[in-house]
Amino acid sequence: MKLHELKAAEGANKASKRVGRGTGSGLGKTSGRGQNGQNSRSGGGVRPGFEGGQMPLYRRLPKRGFKNIFAKEYAAINLDRLNCFEDGTVVTPELLVEKRVVKKVKDGVKILGNGNIEKKLTVKAAKFSKSAIEKIEAAGGKVEVI
């Protein structure tokens, strides 16, 4: 088999509709757009969300909530991700970025308790869940809030 002998799978290449090319084609004259009206015109049609003048859904529903501009966003990491470090390592947010465990530190790192930790580590982070603290200390490690 050579490159010029390759054929696309049956039905993979579909010919585009050629509209406005005579009545015999079935898509002549009005080109599948029906008779007159807004939708038959070039650039015709209504914007997304327009309901024909009826009060649209996005305006019938009440506004809710707000975005707290002072909210802190933490990079969350589960315990099982910390098993990549050697015993006795001091795990800091900078080290986590360096080892590509986390992409960005944001407002700090929060350690969550999903999974198990087999290594004895000293973990420094902004926040810890209760289960994460228990598991780190049970493995013989230390927890430091920074």
From Swiss-Prot:
GO terms for cellular component: cytosolic large ribosomal subunit. Transmembrane segments: none annotated. GO terms for biological process: translation. InterPro entries: Ribosomal_uL15, Ribosomal_uL15/eL18, Ribosomal_uL15/eL18_sf, Ribosomal_uL15_bac-type, Ribosomal_uL15_CS. Gene3D superfamilies: 3.100.10.10. GO terms for molecular function: rRNA binding; structural constituent of ribosome. SUPFAM superfamilies: Ribosomal proteins L15p and L18e (SSF52080). Residues 21-35, 42-52 have a biased composition (Gly residues). It comes from the Bacteria. Pfam families: Ribosomal_L27A. Keywords: Ribonucleoprotein, Ribosomal protein, RNA-binding, rRNA-binding. Residues 1-56 are annotated as: Disordered. Part of the 50S ribosomal subunit. Belongs to the universal ribosomal protein uL15 family. NCBIfam families: rplO_bact. Binds to the 23S rRNA. This is Large ribosomal subunit protein uL15. The lineage of its organism: Bacteria, Bacillati, Bacillota, Clostridia, Eubacteriales. The gene is rplO.
